[in-house]
């Protein structure tokens, strides 16, 4: 109802004082400036900068892009976490942030291999705590010429997406699901995928209930709302986090329907519209996948991120969408019951690091990125 009303406002001239609806839509698309790093990837003279320009396109929680890099000498670098970009409400132990660092490192390694460099990665070289990340390095990377070959999956880096759309009502072939799982079985990570089975139906229900839990828990929902960038101007100013762009959001912003107060209020029309959108996404999932390891160290979380990057690229190569839906794996108190349910269902006595849906989604554009210079210290 809200979406229809906003579109009526556009067509009725409330938003568009002059010109056509088509003109309004054409002028209110996603921010191109916020996507510029995707076009600049690989356009650097130094091989490390070249590799980093691809690494910063990695999937990461809430698109926080928490990577800080210090270049060292001619053939090394150190990766740190930008602690201001943590997610203390939904990711209190920084597990998901660390997984995002692992995905960054895997794209770094694949990009360096294109230039003939092997990457020797040591996770947490100065020690770690499993409570929260701190100012100590996440990883130290040394590049060594030779001893590696280009990875065919690298060709998918610029096309890789997290496809957060409704998927088509058709099953994913078993052969494709097997190939995706095989791509994720790396770095001592177990990867599983399933088609449209009874277990998939249970996971649809579980992931939807976990989403509801997150958005109806005030502190976790507010964390997301505070990180929303509403409209192209906000996205261009802060090309990170959760972007709400396009004609619907621009029109809703102009008429006062889309704002942070409404997005944080479970009784608002905007909140209900958001629930409907996400429920449609959840119920469209016919296939799922998940990653498991022992989670005994931060290195296990890094490895989960590296494995996820591999299978995300494989899914892209197969023309499939993939969308992390891991709310039930989060460690805050209100999610404890669903956390146990998820692990009882598919955990096999170990730690589920990632849970995601797989399917045929529409073609979508890239998400905002901050650019290489924002990550260098």
Show the residue positions of the predicted features.
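Acidic, surface-exposed loops and disordered segments
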Residues: 1-377
